[in-house]
């Protein structure tokens, strides 16, 4: 499994997602609360998956996805009301609320 970065504006949300992934044997490389932190975390990595919420204090998930280096995918976890009907491009969307198994299998699929 590649590098996993968990990124949510609320630290508790990030911890919860991180704990689910770790509990299922998926190592998390970094936990971030802003888009800038995510981009800084990707500097030393060649590829990976960013598991993200919809909005940060400094940017949206779409802006973050546009700035991610090649080799990185973004998995958005948000209510479908946030993104349904929009063309999300290369962003993979997982509707919240979700089942733990859905999160784990989606991360492994990417």
Region spans (language model):
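Conserved phosphotransfer microenvironments
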Residues: 14, 35, 48-69, 80-82
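Acidic, metal-coordinating helix/loop segments flanking the phosphotransfer/catalytic sites
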Residues: 31-49
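A short, hydrophobic beta-strand element within the central beta-sheet of small alpha/beta folds
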Residues: 71-84, 94
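Short loop/helix-cap segments at secondary-structure boundaries that form the rim of catalytic
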Residues: 41-42, 82-91
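Conserved acidic carboxylate
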Residues: 7-8
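Two-component/phosphorelay signaling modules centered on CheY-like receiver
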Residues: 11-30
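C-terminal output helix
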Residues: 98-108
